[in-house]
Amino acid sequence: LKAINAIRMGGVDVLPLVEGGKGVAVSTGASCGEWAGAGGIGTFSGVNADSYDADGNVIRQVYHGRTRRDRHEELVAYGIAGGLAQAREARDRAGPTGRVHMNVLWEMGGAERILRGVLEGAKGLINGITCGAGMPYKLAEISREFNVFYYPIVSSGRAFTALWKRSYSKVSELLGGVVYEDPWLAGGHNGLSNSEDPNKPEAPYERVLKLRQQMRQFGLGDVPIIMAGGVWWLEEWQDWIDNPELGPIAFQFGTRPLVTQESPISEVWKQRLLTLKPGDVLLQPFSPTGFYSSAVRNEFLSDLEHRNERQVAISPEPVGEHTAEYGVGPRKRLVWLAPGDLTRVHNWEAAGYTEALRTPDNTLVFVTPQNSREILKDQTDCMGCLSHCRFSNWTQHGPDYTNGKKADPRSFCIQKTLQDIAHDGPIEHNLMFAGHNAYRFGQDPFYSNGFVPSVRQLVERIMTGR
């Protein structure tokens, strides 16, 4: 293995190993501080982060507001308190010189307010902000206000060029690095564009090279690119290390830090990760954000897949092939279906899927009465955790705080499920984000006999090339 040398990033020399930030409440100050203390760049998530009571117990985020706007205000307050708690713990563990980054999603509810609130209250504790999920144009000016480095997450050179031309060129001195996130391999939400096929992955080398060529045109040849998604053993990336064509490269690990002693996820979740097989992680379109995302196949995803399959197109009047009448809801309001679809509907109803829910796309999906009640309750309980949500039709922009469409029952409340799984909820019935290489836990001798390393042991291991 080539020697893995420190690189210059954010004004200092660090190991080219970056911890990937995972919200809700999975990348904590504990994990971040230990990673930074080991010489890499630690990252805690500022997405609905946990705060703690005087005894160190997690304060569960309970909402009391009458409207979703009121609850959104509570969410922002929880977000700032949680971000501060994680920043303090990260800095305590990292020591004065460890590099601590906060990860936020630009499309999370109240992103800008939470980011400013945490940076305001945590002066001197945070060295950098990593931000993806959308086009975070304002990241540069916020970084300048608080004098921290910024690290946009992009999945193409084109996205970076747009950010650079619109705002980053004005604050180039604080651009610490650019994260290239492989949209086919990374865990969690992915930046697949409309021109890319979820089923046709493209190898990262050419895409990262294009990004570097764009960056060189802007005079950014020495700004590191951080490769995220699909990184496991560094010996597999030897042709990327010290490669003059690519320039300085660091590597981001998001999935591997899930299985560490400091990782806050449940033992059941850790053990499940250690037994995954190739193909157990699914790139799927059900997220209320509108982005594709990658998660472990389980009953939760299977329910969403089947719900989306139990779907028929409807018309408000008989037209074309829509000639079969069907009554929707308690008042049996008439819509028209294709006769073949009516047969399918009768079969679903016979199997217990008796509730027809309308979608924004002039279709009906069929669910059980219990499922229907749960969907409705989750939509009603919305606390505005995204800038806009297709599941509940919330948007954080006034005057009426709705996206103007019907709430979409083909999706789910992401805040509810991520909070639940992060705090010992059942792993079969929640969204379990992971990268596509997670099956390698089961093949990597490092984890044999169910071994769970500390974060520092993991960093040492990665430095051996494996």
Name each model-derived stretch.
Residues 1-220, 400-405, 410-466:
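Active-site entrance/lid segments in N-terminal catalytic domains of soluble metabolic enzymes
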Residues 18, 185-204, 214-222, 234-466:
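Conserved active-site-proximal phosphate/metal-binding subdomains
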Residues 27-30, 233-237:
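Short glycine/serine/threonine-rich phosphate/pyrophosphate-binding segments
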Residues 226-233:
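A short glycine-centered flexible hinge/capping loop motif at secondary-structure junctions
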